[in-house]
Curated annotation (Swiss-Prot):
This is Small ribosomal subunit protein RACK1. GO terms for molecular function: ribosome binding; translation regulator activity. Keywords: Repeat, Ribonucleoprotein, Ribosomal protein, WD repeat. It comes from the Eukaryota. GO terms for cellular component: ribonucleoprotein complex; ribosome. CDD domains: WD40. It holds the Pfam family WD40. WD repeats lie at residues 3-45, 52-93, 94-135, 137-180, 181-221, 222-262, 263-313. It comes from Hydra vulgaris (Hydra). Belongs to the WD repeat G protein beta family. Ribosomal protein RACK1 subfamily.
Amino acid sequence: MEQMTLRGTLKGHNGWVTQIATTPQNPDLILSASRDKTLIQWQLTRDDQTNYGFPKKCLTGHNHFVSDVVLSSDGQFALSCSWDKTLRLWDLNQGITTKQFVGHTKDVLSVAFSADNRQIVSGSRDNTIKLWNTLGQCKYTIQDESHSEWVSCVRFSPNTQNPIIVSCGWDKMVKVWNLTNCKLKTNHFGHTGYLNAVTVSPDGSLCASGGKDGNAMLWDLNEGKHLYTLDGGNVINALCFSPNRYWLCAATGPMIKIWDLEMKSVVDELKPGVIGISTKSRAADCISLAWSADGQTLFAGYTDNLIRVWQVTRSSQ
């Protein structure tokens, strides 16, 4: 039996940790985004529980909450978005912004890179989805048939044979877009509350969505249909598929739920102990999740400004 064990924490942000990005190019580096308006490049040392790594570089420039961050496939560049209405492209070696993307009229909530890193998609509280090139030029704004409320999350499919974008929003909808013509391919109905997260499986065949209603809904991207629903039991703030196991992870309130998708059963439920004796102290919520490229380590960002690091271990049963 496989389970998850808490290995350590990363302390450095002064605000909620809104997103975490990892890269196969450098397993000792992760990047995190925060409501403290910064991004931190972490050097992982894996020393012990209290010192799993240290902040190597702090990237500053956004003047409001940083809501999302992604790494380029070579691990050299990062792309972030913020409630300051902009996106930024960062050269990580130099720790500087090389390009600012201006065009959204309200907070930008989500950003993603296409598989070849040539296209960028962003979603905003202005209810639009924008496609950009790496030079910071907006090539297309999806408005026809777009979300009628905030666009909370946008993701590209990693499958280059089926070039699509998946988005979700506060209108309870999951939408699948044809990347070739930016036209709507499928509307997925079923959620009963606003959506926070959508994620595409590593092979591009499935996507999962979640939000206020606490359900993780799985959709077949090839057939364009609903497959099944998993009960998260609390508001879902983040979702991610394991890169090498048939697992889906959901950040649901203070917990992280991990499902085996073949069995549709819970592999593990991760909850950090509440520190503090006061009965009022509520456990922090988990709001971001990222797997290491090898699928052995799960990084989780919380509203107590910490990143907690969990590792896959084998139990003796």
